[in-house]
Amino acid sequence: MNGGGKNVLNKNSVGSVSEVGPDSTQEETPRDVRLLHLLLASQSIHQYEDQVPLQLMDFAHRYTQGVLKDALVYNDYAGSGNSAGSGLGVEDIRLAIAARTQYQFKPTAPKELMLQLAAERNKKALPQVMGTWGVRLPPEKYCLTAKEWDLEDPKSM
């Protein structure tokens, strides 16, 4: 660590830890990757595999591309009466983001609610297991052994 800068350590796929920081060549590392390294370091994440920034960049690219495609569809639909040269607006992008969050990112239920539902479900006891030997069959009304089933047509014999 020369020059008083802060180094960021990241773990590559072999398990060794490599160093990315002010000492590494800034020209070789793309700007977006450097920003992601700084973002991870600001969140106190100093050890991660080398492909993590690439995966984050891939996710951001795909998400942005999907939002912009949706915004173009909304703009085309809303701009049917407008001139054909109207560009993409901020409202179209906001609508696309809002529509995408409705189905793409499902929020999980709060832990307290899940514990309450589990306690309510667990109030009802499970049926007792009989201490008999052999194969345990379901109740007689659900078994095919309850009646004599003729699967063959007697006329064909």
UniProtKB/Swiss-Prot annotation:
<dbReference type="InterPro" id="IPR051431">
    <property type="entry name" value="TFIID_subunit_9"/>
</dbReference>
<dbReference type="GO" id="GO:0046695">
    <property type="term" value="C:SLIK (SAGA-like) complex"/>
</dbReference>
<dbReference type="GO" id="GO:0006325">
    <property type="term" value="P:chromatin organization"/>
</dbReference>
<dbReference type="GO" id="GO:0005634">
    <property type="term" value="C:nucleus"/>
</dbReference>
<keyword id="KW-0805">Transcription regulation</keyword>
<keyword id="KW-0804">Transcription</keyword>
<dbReference type="GO" id="GO:0003713">
    <property type="term" value="F:transcription coactivator activity"/>
</dbReference>
<dbReference type="GO" id="GO:0005669">
    <property type="term" value="C:transcription factor TFIID complex"/>
</dbReference>
<dbReference type="GO" id="GO:0046982">
    <property type="term" value="F:protein heterodimerization activity"/>
</dbReference>
<comment type="subunit">
    <text>Component of the 1.8 MDa SAGA (Spt-Ada-Gcn5 acetyltransferase) complex, which is composed of 19 subunits TRA1, SPT7, TAF5, NGG1/ADA3, SGF73, SPT20/ADA5, SPT8, TAF12, TAF6, HFI1/ADA1, UBP8, GCN5, ADA2, SPT3, SGF29, TAF10, TAF9, SGF11 and SUS1.</text>
</comment>
<feature type="domain" description="Histone-fold">
    <location>
        <begin position="30"/>
        <end position="97"/>
    </location>
</feature>
<dbReference type="InterPro" id="IPR009072">
    <property type="entry name" value="Histone-fold"/>
</dbReference>
<dbReference type="GO" id="GO:0051123">
    <property type="term" value="P:RNA polymerase II preinitiation complex assembly"/>
</dbReference>
<dbReference type="GO" id="GO:0045944">
    <property type="term" value="P:positive regulation of transcription by RNA polymerase II"/>
</dbReference>
<comment type="similarity">
    <text>Belongs to the TAF9 family.</text>
</comment>
<dbReference type="InterPro" id="IPR003162">
    <property type="entry name" value="TFIID-31"/>
</dbReference>
<dbReference type="GO" id="GO:0006366">
    <property type="term" value="P:transcription by RNA polymerase II"/>
</dbReference>
<dbReference type="GO" id="GO:0003682">
    <property type="term" value="F:chromatin binding"/>
</dbReference>
<dbReference type="GO" id="GO:0006357">
    <property type="term" value="P:regulation of transcription by RNA polymerase II"/>
</dbReference>
<feature type="region of interest" description="Disordered">
    <location>
        <begin position="1"/>
        <end position="29"/>
    </location>
</feature>
<dbReference type="GO" id="GO:0060090">
    <property type="term" value="F:molecular adaptor activity"/>
</dbReference>
<dbReference type="Pfam" id="PF02291">
    <property type="entry name" value="TFIID-31kDa"/>
</dbReference>
<comment type="function">
    <text>Functions as a component of both the DNA-binding general transcription initiation factor complex TFIID and the transcription coactivator SAGA complex. Binding of TFIID to a promoter (with or without TATA element) is the initial step in pre-initiation complex (PIC) formation.</text>
</comment>
<dbReference type="GO" id="GO:0042802">
    <property type="term" value="F:identical protein binding"/>
</dbReference>
<keyword id="KW-0539">Nucleus</keyword>
<protein>
    <recommendedName>
        <fullName>SAGA complex/transcription factor TFIID complex subunit TAF9</fullName>
    </recommendedName>
</protein>
<dbReference type="GO" id="GO:0000124">
    <property type="term" value="C:SAGA complex"/>
</dbReference>
